[in-house]
């Protein structure tokens, strides 16, 4: 969005020829999809030039509801199938536990381009790890970490029950509603969210008896992205630094990629010396290198460290100190996780269907033998 016109009434105009939709009256019930309002967002909201954040697909600006004066967050997306998908998935999830609520959606024109404007509750408490970093001398305990992980898990559980994989669960997408002690932690930014009910074998080019097993269950792969993220966030919560890191200064180095793929991380002292074995075991189950072996969200929520979080020991952790000491490198940590998730999404989206020539399939080998070694079969397709 061009910031210089963000605050001017009329910079966003209604879609020509469209009728105004009735007022939403707050967030839709979970799972309900609504049509965007077609009249100008500036009829209902006073827009500000204050940038609150940058989402995957667009800026997030501060705005105020004209009648109530309520401060909200406005995300502008130029219309595209990807933007529509983001709105659809977020709307479907809105109203779910620990998920940032959508208040309104508009379809307007901006500088001659159709755009979608998502008005959301304003998350004034900032990012999860910033809040821990700002605690100073006040100890952050293992029990608090367990309660935070239970809250994040509750959001993921709701999404997965709606057949949505978020696929971008990372520190900057976990925000508090306010600065108050009783603030609620919520998940936002559905720019990479994906429905998990589609069958990958609707791909026009495949041969069922040699398709790779991961292609038969793609929804497990998309959801396992979220489970891996839970493992990384839990690890950082318990010690203040990430399990995988780049030694080269690159956002994601070949060495870091290799450590992620091989699951090479440790629980070094002194930070991990007093952390419970239950917590370490849960991290191991989330950071499994084979996505199909990672815990499901139901298994995660049923783990004693999560479902009995009030009984987790109140052991003081090194987290706040480490986050404060390493705050100059925190942007690098966030960038590394962003890159790692991007790599993972690409890997899972582009799982190869083996080419017939390279497929070691008993039936095909028998057929080839009959044909005297000549391959008359049509080539398979690589979903690259």
UniProtKB/Swiss-Prot annotation:
Signal peptide: none annotated. Keywords: Acetylation, ATP-binding, Cytoplasm, Kinase, Nucleotide-binding, Nucleus, Phosphoprotein, Serine/threonine-protein kinase, Transferase. Activated following phosphorylation by p38-alpha/MAPK14 following various stresses. Inhibited by ligand 5B (2'-[2-(1,3-benzodioxol-5-yl)pyrimidin-4-yl]-5',6'-dihydrospiro[piperidine-4,7'-pyrrolo[3,2-c]pyridin]- 4'(1'h)-one) and ligand P4O (2-[2-(2-fluorophenyl)pyridin-4-yl]-1,5,6,7-tetrahydro- 4h-pyrrolo[3,2-c]pyridin-4-one), 2 ATP-competitive inhibitors. Phosphorylated and activated by MAPK1/ERK2 and MAPK3/ERK1. Phosphorylated and activated by MAP kinase p38-alpha/MAPK14 at Thr-203, Ser-253 and Thr-315. InterPro entries: Kinase-like_dom_sf, MAPKAPK_C, Prot_kinase_dom, Protein_kinase_ATP_BS, Ser/Thr_kinase_AS. Its EC number is 2.7.11.1. Residues 372-384 have a biased composition (Polar residues). CDD domains: STKc_MAPKAPK3. A motif (Bipartite nuclear localization signal 1) lies at residues 352-355. A motif (Nuclear export signal (NES)) lies at residues 337-346. Residues 1-33, 359-384 are annotated as: Disordered. One of its GO terms (molecular function) is mitogen-activated protein kinase binding. A motif (Bipartite nuclear localization signal 2) lies at residues 366-370. It is found in: Nucleus; Cytoplasm. The modification N-acetylmethionine is found at residue 1. Stress-activated serine/threonine-protein kinase involved in cytokines production, endocytosis, cell migration, chromatin remodeling and transcriptional regulation. Following stress, it is phosphorylated and activated by MAP kinase p38-alpha/MAPK14, leading to phosphorylation of substrates. Phosphorylates serine in the peptide sequence, Hyd-X-R-X(2)-S, where Hyd is a large hydrophobic residue. MAPKAPK2 and MAPKAPK3, share the same function and substrate specificity, but MAPKAPK3 kinase activity and level in protein expression are lower compared to MAPKAPK2. Belongs to the protein kinase superfamily. CAMK Ser/Thr protein kinase family. Heterodimer with p38-alpha/MAPK14. The heterodimer with p38-alpha/MAPK14 forms a stable complex: molecules are positioned 'face to face' so that the ATP-binding sites of both kinases are at the heterodimer interface. Interacts with TCF3 and with polycomb proteins, such as PCH2 and BMI1/PCGF4. This is MAP kinase-activated protein kinase 3.
């Amino acid at each position: 969005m061009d910031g210089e016109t963000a605050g001017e009434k009329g910079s966003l105009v209604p879609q020509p020829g469209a009728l105004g939709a009735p007022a939403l009256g707050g967030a839709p019930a979970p799972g309900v999809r609504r049509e965007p309002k077609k009249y100008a967002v500036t009829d209902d909201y006073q827009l500000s030039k204050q940038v609150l954040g940058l989402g995957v697909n667009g800026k997030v600006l501060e705005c105020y509801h004209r009648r109530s004066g309520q401060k909200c967050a406005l995300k502008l997306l130029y219309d595209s199938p990807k933007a529509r998908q983001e709105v659809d998935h977020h709307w479907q999830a809105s109203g779910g536990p620990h998920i940032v609520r959508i208040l309104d959606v508009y379809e307007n024109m901006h500088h001659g381009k159709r755009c979608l404007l998502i008005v959301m509750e304003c998350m004034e408490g900032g990012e999860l790890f910033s809040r821990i970093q700002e605690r100073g001398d006040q100890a952050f305990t293992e029990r608090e970490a367990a309660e935070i992980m239970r809250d994040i898990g509750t959001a993921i559980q709701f999404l997965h029950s709606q057949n949505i994989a978020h696929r971008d669960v990372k520190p900057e997408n976990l925000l508090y509603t306010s600065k108050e002690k009783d603030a609620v932690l919520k998940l936002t930014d559905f720019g990479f969210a994906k429905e998990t009910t589609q069958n990958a074998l609707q791909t026009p080019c495949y041969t069922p008896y040699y398709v790779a097993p991961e292609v038969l269950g793609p929804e497990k792969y998309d959801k396992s992205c979220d489970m891996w993220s839970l493992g990384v966030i839990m690890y950082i919560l318990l010690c203040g630094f990430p399990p995988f890191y780049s030694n080269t200064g690159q956002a994601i180095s070949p060495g870091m990629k290799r450590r992620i793929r091989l699951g090479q991380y440790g629980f070094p002292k002194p930070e991990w010396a007093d952390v419970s074995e239950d917590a370490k075991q849960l991290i191991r189950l989330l950071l499994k290198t084979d996505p199909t072996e990672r815990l499901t969200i139901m298994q995660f929520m049923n783990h004693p460290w999560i479902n009995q979080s009030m009984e987790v020991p109140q052991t003081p952790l090194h987290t706040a100190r480490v986050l404060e000491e390493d705050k100059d490198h925190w942007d690098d940590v966030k960038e590394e996780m962003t890159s790692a998730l991007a790599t993972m999404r690409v890997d899972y989206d582009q799982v190869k269907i083996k080419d017939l020539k390279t497929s070691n399939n008993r039936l095909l080998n028998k057929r080839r033998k009959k044909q005297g070694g000549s391959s008359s079969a049509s080539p398979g397709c690589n979903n690259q």
